[in-house]
Swiss-Prot record:
The active site is at K70. Gene3D superfamilies: Leucine Dehydrogenase, chain A, domain 1, NAD(P)-binding Rossmann-like Domain. Homodimer. Involved in the biosynthesis of the chorismate, which leads to the biosynthesis of aromatic amino acids. Catalyzes the reversible NADPH linked reduction of 3-dehydroshikimate (DHSA) to yield shikimate (SA). It is an enzyme of class 1 (oxidoreductase). This is Shikimate dehydrogenase (NADP(+)). GO terms for cellular component: cytosol. Keywords: Amino-acid biosynthesis, Aromatic amino acid biosynthesis, NADP, Oxidoreductase. Shikimate binds at S19, K20, S21, T66, N91, D107, Y224. Its EC number is 1.1.1.25. One of its GO terms (biological process) is shikimate metabolic process. It comes from Roseobacter denitrificans (strain ATCC 33942 / OCh 114) (Erythrobacter sp. (strain OCh 114)). Belongs to the shikimate dehydrogenase family. SUPFAM superfamilies: Aminoacid dehydrogenase-like, N-terminal domain (SSF53223), NAD(P)-binding Rossmann-fold domains (SSF51735).
Amino acid sequence: MSMTKIPLAGVMGAPIAHSKSPQLHRHWLETYGISGFYVPMEVKAADVEHVLRTLPKMGFVGLNVTLPHKEAVLKLADQITDRARLIGAANTLTFGKDGEIHADNTDGYGFLENLRSGATDWTPSQGPAVVLGAGGAARAVIVALLDAGVPEIILTNRTRARSDQLQSDFGNRVRVMDWTQISGVLHEAQLLVNTTSLGMVGKPEMEASLDGLQAHTTVTDLVYNPLKTRLLEVAEEKGCVTVDGLGMLLHQGVPGFERWFGRRPDVTDATRAAVLG
């Protein structure tokens, strides 16, 4: 008598205790009555390759990857999606039957799905997007926005050199502005995105001037702790449509869950409540 294997998946990072992914995937497993497990794993940098070679032999079908391993796993992958290659990092791994590693990055997908569900009147072709920050999250957002058809991205970061590097990587659809001058271009923006940690619990507040922000601009913040950052509060006061950052986390988990467990999950109010709870 053959026994059906129960699929195993998880999330790997260091530290890992803060991750919301276990609550998210366990909620979906329970909601859809799927036999499967999703486990958090704290893994040191020196052990990443060994873990990735071992997990498929233990019955794991895939893995989410969080900081600081998102770039390292890309170098160990056998197959890499175009978007993961452009971003230079992977957050979703799927293991083949012989242990081969397929690497993807669903951060940009999650960002766009969250934006589209929270700001239904926003369309990419409306006009420029102003992006605050130039780290890994900014790369994912830029790749997604350019691919969606945003005509221009105005990029600013407290360290100018990092913005210049992204402009060099992505070309003339990205324009770099000094952090201190951003208020002067906000009136152009159809979309404003904060990809920095400013405004997060335990981090400094957003100090960039928002004087030029107009009511026609959609504003979204990747920070989700707190759900309503100072940036979103100011934007609401100015009449802007705002979108918090929690939905990006939820939506980026959809493709991996579908690949590992065979069911495409929905992101609902119950999903948000399960992760926040």
